[in-house]
Amino acid sequence: LAVYAAAMNFSIFDISLVTFMLAISGAISQYPVGYISDKFDRRKVIIYSTFGAAIFAFFAIFSVGTMYLPDGLGSSKFWFYIFLIAFSVCSLPMFSLILAHTNDFITRDKFVAAGASLQFAFGLGAISGPFLCSLLMDLIGNNGFFVFLIIFHCLIGVFAVYRMKIRPSEENPDSQFVAVPTTITPVGMELNPTTEPIEEPEKI
């Protein structure tokens, strides 16, 4: 992002500002996006987030293009900052969403291995992404930065739609939740065959 901002003739202050806004908005968005993903199907949240990020990246391209129009016609950087923040809110929680979705389909003893594998894949993307993005920027211009992000997020969104069609949502295999009335007694809980036995305290 800093390289893109420098190529677009942003000042040093503007470059530091967009970098700060991208990081802080992405960090804050972890909480509301995580809460929403706990209430609804995570794959739907991933789909909305990826396509939302792609849409806001497109708007960012448009807003940057209007900033360099003649006086009286051009827009300020305000809208670019707004679209950048909206993009960050949709994009940066993606790793957490995918990790949480993965944990929904595996047992608890595989959480660490799954997290390590996803972190490795994330690292490969962090290494190859800037290189591939720079090639696209050299090919089509500075806006290749956001074009690359649009393509990348759309691919994730399309894959999520594909997975939703071939695999239904299921509960966590470690979950032992059973819906019971509020008036149930402790005896009713003990009669549930899926409830783990509770050890009686030793008498002194």
Task: Identify what each model region corresponds to.
Residues K44-F59, I150:
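Structural signature of the two symmetry-related core transmembrane helices
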Residues G52-L73:
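C-terminal ends and interior cores of transmembrane alpha-helices
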Residues I12-F13, I106-L118:
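Loop-to-transmembrane helix entry/capping segments in MFS-fold secondary transporters
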Residues L135-H153:
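A membrane-interface helix-boundary motif in multi-pass transporters
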Residues L92-I106:
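Intracellular juxtamembrane helix-capping segments at the cytosolic ends
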Residues L1-D14:
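Short amphipathic helix-loop junctions that connect adjacent transmembrane helices
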Residues R163-I204:
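Intrinsic disorder in cytosolic terminal tails and internal cytosolic loops
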Residues S29-D41, M137-D138:
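Helix-to-loop junctions at the C-terminal end of transmembrane segments
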